[in-house]
A protein has these predicted regions:
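N-terminal glycine-rich phosphate-binding loop and ensuing alpha1 helix
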Residues: 1-80, 364
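Short internal beta-strands
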Residues: 53-59, 135-138, 286
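Conserved beta-loop-beta/alpha segment of the NTase-like Rossmann-fold superfamily
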Residues: 63-141
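Conserved beta strand-loop-helix elements of the APE1-like EEP
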Residues: 143-156
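Extended, small-residue-rich solenoid/repeat segments and analogous flexible loops
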Residues: 155, 159-250
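C-terminal segments of enzyme domains that contribute to small-molecule binding surfaces
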Residues: 288-392
Length: 392
C-alpha cells in the first residue's frame, strides 16, 4: 500500500498571550532536542513504519533564518515553503499531488505536537472502519492535529485544510494515541521534551554515547578536566564545556554550544550554536539565539550583550577561521612569555636574597635568631616562609 505523509509547520495566528510555538522567530519543531530536531524525529518515526515519502510545508523561509539552512533532512523529504496565509492552500494542493502520484492513504500531521503514535495501528483502525478521515486523540480524548485520509476523500481533505484542521466534513471514530504526547507550544514544552528524553520517558533517545550512567556526550564534544557534569545531562556534538563549569540537574547542551569558565547551568537547555558567558548562573530556562526564556516566570527576553549570551558561527569554515585566529593570537603571547619568564624568575631570586646592610625586621634578637635558623634548616635562602593554614 502506498502511504505518504504531509507535515505542516506553522499555519497559526496566535492572539496576544497565546503560545506561538516558536522560540525567537524559529519554530520549536525545527529546534534540536538531544541532538536531533523534532521534525527529524517525526520523519524518522514515519520511516520506521514504512512511510518514507514526506512533504514538509513550513511558513518560515529557510532563507530568512541561517539556522534553518543548516538543518539536515532526509533525502526523501520534500521541503516546501508557503506564506502563512497560503500554507493551507499549499497543503491541499500537495494532497492532490500525492493522490495523483498513486498514494492510497495520506497521513497529515501539524508540528505542533510531538506525538509518538503507532502508525500501523492507526492505519489499521482507519481501514477497519472504512473511514474517509480518521483523527487522533490523546488519552484524555483531546483532539490532536494528526489525521489519516483516504485518497478518495478529496472533498473531506478540502474541508479539513480550509478549516485549518479544525473541522471534519463527516464524523468518524477517532483513534486514541496511547504513546507519549507533547503539545510543544512553548519553550517550557521544549524543555520538558528534552528532560523526558533524558529520563527515558519517551523515544527521543540522546544522539551520542553514554559515557557514564545518565551522562551523554555527542561526537567531538569536549569537556575540560576541571568541569563537572552531574547526571542526567547531555552535551551535544562539537560542544565545549570549559574549566570550572558545572552542568547539572537534567541540563541539555545542544550541538556546537559553548559553556564558558565557571558558569553553572542547572535544569536548562542551551540551544545549538549558543555561547554562554563566563561566571553565570543559568537556571530553569532555555537559552539560545541571544534570548533567554525563564520557565518558572514564563518570560522571554532578548540579550544584547554577547559576553552573556552570544552566537557561534554556523558555518564550519567560519568556526575554523575563528579557532585559527584565536590560535595565532595565543601563540605569540606564549612564545614571548617563554622568553621573558626565566629572566623574571632570576630577577625575583635576586630581589629575594637578603642584603648584608639591611636592618632586621624584628627587634627581638632571640626571635630573629630562632626564625633565621629554622628557615635556613628547612628552606633555601631564596624562599619566603609563610603560614600554611592561616593563623592557627
Amino acid at each position: 500500500m502506498d502511504i505518504r505523509a504531509i507535515l505542516l509547520i506553522g499555519g497559526i495566528s496566535p492572539k496576544d498571550g497565546e503560545p506561538t510555538e516558536r522560540f525567537g522567530n524559529i519554530p520549536l519543531a525545527c529546534l534540536d532536542v538531544l541532538g536531533m530536531s523534532v521534525e527529524e524525529r517525526v520523519v524518522q518515526r514515519l520511516a520506521h513504519f514504512g512511510i518514507t515519502i514526506c512533504s514538509l510545508i513550513a511558513d518560515s523561509p529557510a532563507e530568512g533564518q541561517p539556522f534553518l539552512r543548516c538543518r539536515s533532512l532526509d533525502s526523501r523529504t520534500r521541503p516546501l515553503h508557503a506564506e502563512s496565509e497560503q500554507l493551507w492552500q499549499a497543503a491541499e494542493q500537495e494532497f492532490q499531488r500525492c493522490v495523483e502520484d498513486g498514494a492510497e492513504l495520506v497521513v497529515v500531521l501539524r508540528l505542533g505536537a510531538y506525538v509518538e503514535v503507532d502508525y500501523e495501528e492507526m492505519i489499521q483502525h482507519h481501514l477497519d472502519r472504512r473511514s474517509c478521515v480518521t483523527q487522533a486523540v490523546d488519552v484524555n480524548s483531546s483532539p490532536l492535529e494528526l489525521f489519516v485520509l483516504s485518497a478518495s476523500a478529496r472533498m473531506d481533505a478540502a474541508e479539513l485544510f480550509q478549516s485549518r484542521l479544525g473541522h471534519l466534513r463527516r464524523e468518524s471514530e477517532p483513534f486514541q494515541v496511547k504513546g507519549y504526547v507533547n503539545r510543544l507550544q512553548s519553550a517550557s514544552d521544549l524543555r520538558r521534551l528534552a528532560l523526558d528524553g533524558l529520563l527515558a520517558r519517551n523515544a527521543a533517545v540522546p544522539q551520542g554515547k553514554e559515557v557514564k550512567p545518565g551522562i551523554w556526550l555527542g561526537p567531538s564534544a569536549r569537556v575540560h578536566r576541571k568541569a563537572r557534569i552531574v547526571a542526567p545531562a547531555y552535551v551535544g556534538a562539537g560542544s565545549k564545556i570549559r574549566a570550572s563549569a558545572l552542568i547539572t540537574r537534567g541540563t541539555v547542551v545542544e550541538q556546537h554550544a559553548v559553556v564558558d569558565c565557571g558558569t553553572v547551568v542547572e535544569n536548562t537547555t542551551v540551544l545549538p550554536f549558543t555561547c554562554l558567558g563566563a561566571g553565570l548562573d543559568a537556571m530553569h530556562c532555555v537559552v539560545g539565539f541571544r534570548r533567554v526564556a525563564h520557565l518558572a516566570r514564563n518570560v522571554e527576553v532578548e540579550v544584547h550583550d554577547e559576553k552573556l549570551v552570544g552566537t557561534i558561527p554556523l558555518s564550519p569554515v567560519s568556526r575554523l577561521a575563528g579557532s585559527t585566529a584565536a590560535l595565532f593570537a595565543f601563540l605569540p603571547k606564549e612564545i614571548y612569555r617563554g622568553f621573558v619568564s626565566p629572566w623574571r624568575r632570576k630577577q625575583a631570586v635576586r630581589n629575594a636574597e637578603p642584603s648584608e646592610e639591611a636592618e632586621p625586621s624584628l627587634e627581638s634578637p632571640g626571635l630573629e635568631a630562632s626564625a633565621s635558623e629554622s628557615e635556613t634548616s628547612e628552606f633555601p635562602s631564596n624562599f619566603a616562609v609563610v603560614r600554611r593554614y592561616g593563623n592557627h
